[in-house]
Amino acid sequence: DQDCLPGWSFYEGNCYKAFDEPKSWVDAEKFCQKQSNGKHLASIEGLGKANFVAKLVSEDQSETLREPQIHVWIGLRDQSERQQCSSHWTDGSAVSYECGLAYPFIC
């Protein structure tokens, strides 16, 4: 079904959109949930979807999302007691961001 709201992009059964208003991880997730049909921050499974999301960010017309090495929130999160979003890549290296920092995000 390709019935996405205006401004959203369809990929493999879901609709996605980049938002350039910086929010914390929690606030970005809440924002996404308020969108049509209780959406969430984007989950990225596989290279195809990773490339699609990267293209969404690179094609966005806002100044914020065109900055070099911009961080964006996605649905990856494993919260520790210190309020950090952390997980691990397949090579074992850590991925860690302060969840309270405000970044653009992808629903």
From Swiss-Prot:
* Tissue expression summary: Expressed by the venom gland.
Give Gene Ontology CC terms: extracellular region
Alphabetically, the GO molecular function entries are:
toxin activity
* Localization (cell): Secreted
Which Cys residues form disulphide pairs? Answer: 4-15, 32-107
**Which InterPro entries has this protein been placed in?**
C-type_lectin-like, C-type_lectin-like/link_sf, C-type_lectin/snaclec_domain, CTDL_fold
Protein keywords:
Disulfide bond, Secreted, Toxin
Show where the C-type lectin domain sits.
11-107
- What task does this protein carry out? Inhibits integrin alpha-2/beta-1- (ITGA2/ITGB1) dependent melanoma metastasis.
Q: Which family does it belong to?
A: Belongs to the snaclec family.
Q: Assembly and partners?
A: Heterodimer of subunits alpha and beta; disulfide-linked.
Q: What is this protein called?
A: Snaclec VP12 subunit A
**What is the originating organism of this protein?**
Daboia palaestinae (Palestine viper)
